Every structure is written in C-alpha cells, then in structure tokens.
C-alpha cells in the first residue's frame, strides 16, 4: 500500500505547490490524477519517489517510509517504484532491448552494470515483456528510430522489468495521438490487473481518466478537491477541479521531461 499523508511542497520563493495532500492506493487500483495545468499533478507524482523533494508530510510504501531516506536507502526503495515519463526518457543511442534492460541496472554489481552484463533471467524476462508490449521485431532498433507510441511502450517495459510494487506515470499520453493514447492506457490497465500492482497516472485527458481509472483524484491549486470513482465525476465536480486559471505550480512546477540523460534514467532505475 502507498500512503501519502499531508504532503507539502513549498518552493524557495515561499509559494506552495502542494497543500496537505493525503490519499492511499492499494491492490491493483488505477488512480488518475487530473486537474488544470499547474495544479501540482507532476509535482505530486514526482514527489512520491522524491524526484521532487517534498517539504512536509509523509510518504510510505508498505512498511517503508520514503520521506527522510538517505541516498542508498532511497535507491533501494526506488526499485519498488517504476516510473514512466512524459518524454519517455530513453537513451537514444541504445537499442530497444538495451533500454528495457536498463531497468535492471540497479540490481547489478557496479562492474556488471558498467559492462551491461545481465544475467540470463533478466534477458529472458526482457524478451517476455517485449512480446507483452507488442515490440517484437524491433528489439534491435535504436530508440531514436521508433514512433512515439513505440517509445512509450519501451518506457513502460523498462518500468515493468523492475518488478515494482507500484507504477508512477507522469503524463504518459501527452505526446501521443488519441488512438495511441488509448492503446497505452489499455496496456497500463492490463499490467495493473495482471501483475496485481497499483498505478498512479498524472493525466490531462479527462475522458481517458474516466474510461480507464478505478478512481480519480482532482487537484486544484495544490489541493485535493475530488477523490472518488469516475461515475461520481459530474459537471459540478469538474467545475470545482477546473475552476481556476494559472496557479503557482504553472510558474514553478518542473517539467516531467527535464531529466532525459542516461544518468537520470539509470538513477531512476535505482542504480
């Protein structure tokens, strides 16, 4: 179970991007985070694994409190949190298979990680996941040769090969066309149910949230103003979520696509 308790994010300027956010996620629940641009959605998702450092509150995954962990312990817990990025965060010069296997780098010794010497079980599982995300036949293609939908599937496969306890997806469909967006959401739904893990998805497209999520959390100006099933997201609830214009986080919230180099990808895998 993931527990977020009274989470706060205050920037150096004194502006508050998250204001006492609390919720729990468990089982194979798919939770969509919606809200206007700058409401704090990316800040929230990225605070869970401390890509963005919260300034108050508590985050725990099962029996491990994530907030306050030192560097080595944080690396360990990040292995249990698969991250899927808006801008894919692939290493462009590497092949599809190499990008997927990078999700296992944190489990290797320093020497084996440097040489990318993966055990046979990791390679077998990578091939299995290739089939699962419909990337058979392109495993030897470089990442920069792929379409947007294929690139996001590689990102999903890289997260899944970690065997995480939870998946965090930061706007996974924002760079995709409508049909491909639905394919990606369907794939994430299948993964949640088949692997029995929860997924938290920051998403702009309300219709996708309604169609694919089990629960929707609506953020407005850094606060939860809706938390319930899609069927309860009536027009009044939508008006409450989207009532404002530009918020603090529009000016301060970092883009989910800012960390794109190989070191950040490897760090995110837990190495």
Swiss-Prot record:
<keyword id="KW-0067">ATP-binding</keyword>
<dbReference type="GO" id="GO:0005886">
    <property type="term" value="C:plasma membrane"/>
</dbReference>
<dbReference type="InterPro" id="IPR003439">
    <property type="entry name" value="ABC_transporter-like_ATP-bd"/>
</dbReference>
<dbReference type="GO" id="GO:0015416">
    <property type="term" value="F:ABC-type phosphonate transporter activity"/>
</dbReference>
<dbReference type="InterPro" id="IPR012693">
    <property type="entry name" value="ABC_transpr_PhnC"/>
</dbReference>
<comment type="similarity">
    <text>Belongs to the ABC transporter superfamily. Phosphonates importer (TC 3.A.1.9.1) family.</text>
</comment>
<protein>
    <recommendedName>
        <fullName>Phosphonates import ATP-binding protein PhnC 2</fullName>
        <ecNumber>7.3.2.2</ecNumber>
    </recommendedName>
</protein>
<keyword id="KW-0547">Nucleotide-binding</keyword>
<feature type="domain" description="ABC transporter">
    <location>
        <begin position="2"/>
        <end position="246"/>
    </location>
</feature>
<keyword id="KW-0918">Phosphonate transport</keyword>
<feature type="binding site">
    <location>
        <begin position="35"/>
        <end position="42"/>
    </location>
    <ligand>
        <name>ATP</name>
    </ligand>
</feature>
<feature type="compositionally biased region" description="Basic and acidic residues">
    <location>
        <begin position="243"/>
        <end position="254"/>
    </location>
</feature>
<keyword id="KW-1003">Cell membrane</keyword>
<dbReference type="InterPro" id="IPR050086">
    <property type="entry name" value="MetN_ABC_transporter-like"/>
</dbReference>
<keyword id="KW-0472">Membrane</keyword>
<keyword id="KW-1278">Translocase</keyword>
<dbReference type="Pfam" id="PF00005">
    <property type="entry name" value="ABC_tran"/>
</dbReference>
<dbReference type="GO" id="GO:0016887">
    <property type="term" value="F:ATP hydrolysis activity"/>
</dbReference>
<dbReference type="GO" id="GO:0005524">
    <property type="term" value="F:ATP binding"/>
</dbReference>
<dbReference type="InterPro" id="IPR027417">
    <property type="entry name" value="P-loop_NTPase"/>
</dbReference>
<comment type="subunit">
    <text>The complex is composed of two ATP-binding proteins (PhnC), two transmembrane proteins (PhnE) and a solute-binding protein (PhnD).</text>
</comment>
<comment type="function">
    <text>Part of the ABC transporter complex PhnCDE involved in phosphonates import. Responsible for energy coupling to the transport system.</text>
</comment>
<dbReference type="InterPro" id="IPR003593">
    <property type="entry name" value="AAA+_ATPase"/>
</dbReference>
<keyword id="KW-0813">Transport</keyword>
<feature type="region of interest" description="Disordered">
    <location>
        <begin position="243"/>
        <end position="271"/>
    </location>
</feature>
<dbReference type="InterPro" id="IPR017871">
    <property type="entry name" value="ABC_transporter-like_CS"/>
</dbReference>
């Amino acid at each position: 179970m993931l527990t977020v308790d009274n989470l706060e994010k205050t920037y150096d300027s004194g502006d508050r991007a998250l204001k006492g956010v609390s919720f729990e996620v468990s089982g194979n629940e798919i939770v969509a985070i919606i809200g206007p641009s700058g409401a704090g959605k990316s800040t929230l998702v990225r605070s869970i694994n401390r890509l963005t450092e919260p300034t108050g509150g508590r985050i725990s995954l099962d029996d491990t409190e994530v907030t306050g962990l030192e560097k080595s312990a944080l690396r360990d817990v990040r292995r249990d949190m698969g991250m899927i990025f808006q801008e894919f965060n692939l290493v462009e010069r590497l092949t599809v298979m190499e990008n997927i296997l990078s999700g296992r780098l944190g489990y290797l010794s320093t020497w084996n990680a440097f040489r990318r010497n993966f055990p046979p079980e990791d390679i077998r599982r990578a091939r299995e996941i290739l089939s699962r995300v419909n990337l058979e036949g392109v495993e030897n293609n470089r990442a920069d040769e792929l379409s947007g939908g294929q690139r996001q599937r590689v990102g999903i496969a890289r997260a899944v090969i970690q065997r995480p306890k939870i998946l965090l997806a930061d706007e996974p469909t924002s760079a995709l066309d409508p049909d491909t967006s639905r394919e990606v959401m369907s794939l994430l739904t299948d993964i949640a149910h088949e692997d029995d893990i929860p997924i938290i998805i920051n998403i702009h497209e309300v219709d996708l949230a309604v169609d694919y999520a089990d629960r929707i959390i609506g953020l407005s100006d850094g606060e939860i103003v809706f938390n319930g099933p899609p069927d309860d997201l009536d027009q009044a609830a939508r008006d409450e979520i989207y009532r404002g214009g530009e918020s603090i986080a529009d000016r301060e919230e970092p883009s989910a696509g800012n960390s794109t180099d190989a070191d950040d990808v490897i760090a995110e895998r837990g190495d």
